[in-house]
Amino acid sequence: MTKTSDFDDKVNYSGDYKGNYSNNYSGDYRDNYSSDYSATGYARLEKSLIDIVKEQQAKLGYRKEIVRLYYPLSTLRHFFECAGDDNKIAAGMISEQQMLEILAPNNLPKQLTDTIGEIKITAKNERFCIEIPPEGSEYVHENTADNEFISELIALVGTHGCTMEQITELFYKYSDDIEKKDMQNGEFDCYIRFLNEPDDTYYYCFHDEGCHIIYHRFLPQDYADFGF
């Protein structure tokens, strides 16, 4: 029997999107993106999926199993509406049904399916479930470099008595160029992010719950949407 794992982290926060969009967009979505795969929305999605699976495997260990990840439509829009200078899709235009079309099996590029596998997509109320097959989990485990920073961060916040000073020192271990700011939104105490690490642009948001510190990480566009 194939095992499954559901992973719904705050990086995939399912908040409300406040923009307006048209349901009448027509055209071949694939024509809107650069011929350079790395500049496409599909490549952005692939990187996000791999990042989250890596984080999950660092937290829970590796198992060759189905993994289900959850994204709000607003996050997926950011991937496909910010995919190069030749992009013709205006911000906020892509509807839930249109996103399902973009992510339909016949539209997925080979570069994506060769790595993460034949993903399956469902959606309800602008919340998308992306099901990664066991082969995708295996690919991430066997063919991508370990994220040593994430592994160390997860181990550190799981340690009794962990402090923000220790967490800040860990960031400095990997880069001298970081930004740390207090947050006063009732949910998080501060964020830390790397300023010149193109492969890690996340906002790492931390909250001290007294007995331990928790974190969630957000893509920059999502962080801006939430208005923290």
Predicted segment positions?
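Charge-enriched amphipathic alpha-helical scaffolds
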Residues: 67, 77-118, 188-191
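Intrinsically disordered, low-complexity regulatory segments enriched in Ser/Thr/Pro
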Residues: 198-228
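Positively charged, polyanion-binding regions of nucleic-acid-associated proteins
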Residues: 36-69, 79, 152-155
